[in-house]
Amino acid sequence: MTDLSKSKCKPCEGGVAPYSAQQAKDMLRQLKGWSIEDGKLAKLYPFANYYQTMAFVNALAWISHREDHHPDLTVGYNKCRVEYSTHAVGGLSENDFICAAKCDALFEL
């Protein structure tokens, strides 16, 4: 099994089919605590305070820029919900799972 957090996102401009439900389920096994909700990969990260939450969000923004793949974020005082989907393909792609693994690696720092 590949360490997704060490993989790099591939440019995606559409013309590629999204993962099937089975493909997404198979990829989900490589991630801890993530779920597929309404066709999006989602996870809620808890933090001790607002400072830690915002430090995570800012670091994630840098990773997202570097990978050119950006999540939808919902930020609260001590939590951040991260959702990934690939708009260009209208569903989930490998890039979503790569970035989810990078989120987990960041959270574990």
Which ranges hold each PLM region?
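Charge-rich alpha-helical segments
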Residues: 1-109
